[in-house]
């Protein structure tokens, strides 16, 4: 009797293991949803649709991009956190999944607890730009100018808690300067006042600043990434300009609900990495001013933890709240 019971249990375990293996091998066998918190037409949306189309071609299953903007991407993130843990609902994230738990008092999720890292797809370079009439011509000169100015220089950003604002706060700490933050309702109004000379300096995405840089209407000082931008190859990094290790970048990522099977996560990540190696995909992303990454889940998980520690410290020290 005991032997029969043991054989029965063994057979049951084998069946469960086989079923789990089959689920992983067959993934995906139905449509996959890519949820993002940004509107259609923006850089993150373009990355999502490009990668989504390539995944669809590779998998032979529909990959549907769903834009759910609002509340600083919290709506989209909450949807994915609460979705079935099967890999069929994925989040196309940004740096907001890392910083929002510190910026918003009503965020109930934590990226390290409620989401699992799949892939860091791309990094978007940020450039420190100034109006050409600003006396400083390089980073050291700008830091000296900021220190000499009572209350610091005025810095524009796309809004309170925006990437530009957070980068400014990190820069203030790293450079040992003070600054007056001037938040706008979006990038375009901030750029308009920068171009008009009403504010002297700001951190902005390379892509949005590039036309004005080429036209001589803005002067690039340094990029806030660890590598130079291929769109601005002559502009130094912050490290090269005198602030070692300084990094602030935009992100396009893929995350899944915590509890998603590791085998499914590994498959999705590996397929994304393979897609990002395709020359036509790389060329399109680089042409958008993006740095192609395609990390493993472990690499991305480590990055999320490091960035959470860094930005949490910056946000708390500056007392920034977005709600």
State what each model feature region is.
Residues 22-113, 152, 160, 176-205, ...:
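N-terminal (or domain-start) structured segment
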Residues 14-22:
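N-terminal signal peptide c-region/cleavage motif recognized by signal peptidases
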Residues 1-12:
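Bacterial N-terminal signal peptides that target proteins for export
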Residues 82-88, 102-189, 238, 251-284:
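Hinge/capping helix and adjacent helix->loop/strand transition within the periplasmic-binding protein
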């Amino acid at each position: 009797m005991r032997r029969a019971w043991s054989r029965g249990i063994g057979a049951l375990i084998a069946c469960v293991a086989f079923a789990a293996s089959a689920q992983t091998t067959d993934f995906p066998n139905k449509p996959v949803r890519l949820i993002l918190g940004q509107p259609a037409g923006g850089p993150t949306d373009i990355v999502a649709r490009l990668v989504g189309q390539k995944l669809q071609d590779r998998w032979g299953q529909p990959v549907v991009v769903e834009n759910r903007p609002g509340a600083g991407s919290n709506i989209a993130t909450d949807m994915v956190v609460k979705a079935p843990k099967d890999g069929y609902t994925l989040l196309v994230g940004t740096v907001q999944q890392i910083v929002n738990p510190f910026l918003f008092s009503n965020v109930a999720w934590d990226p390290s607890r409620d989401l699992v890292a799949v892939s860091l797809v791309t990094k978007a370079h940020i450039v420190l730009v100034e109006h050409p009439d600003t006396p400083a011509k390089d980073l050291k000169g700008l830091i000296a100018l900021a220190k000499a100015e009572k209350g610091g220089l005025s810095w524009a950003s796309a809004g309170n808690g925006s990437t530009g604002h957070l980068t400014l706060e990190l820069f203030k700490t790293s450079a040992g300067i003070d600054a007056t933050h001037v938040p706008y309702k979006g990038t375009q109004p901030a750029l308009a006042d920068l171009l008009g000379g009403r504010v002297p300096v700001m951190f902005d995405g390379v892509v949005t600043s590039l036309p004005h840089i080429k036209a001589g209407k803005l002067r690039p000082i340094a990029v806030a990434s660890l590598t130079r931008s291929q769109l601005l190859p002559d502009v130094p990094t912050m490290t090269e300009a005198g602030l070692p290790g300084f990094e602030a970048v935009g992100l396009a990522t893929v995350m899944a609900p915590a509890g998603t099977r590791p085998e499914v996560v590994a498959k999705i990540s590996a397929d994304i990495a393979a897609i990002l190696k395709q020359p036509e995909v790389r060329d399109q992303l680089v042409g958008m001013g993006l740095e192609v990454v395609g990390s493993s889940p472990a690499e991305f998980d480590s990055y999320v933890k490091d960035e959470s520690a860094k930005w949490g410290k910056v946000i708390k020290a500056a007392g920034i709240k977005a709600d």
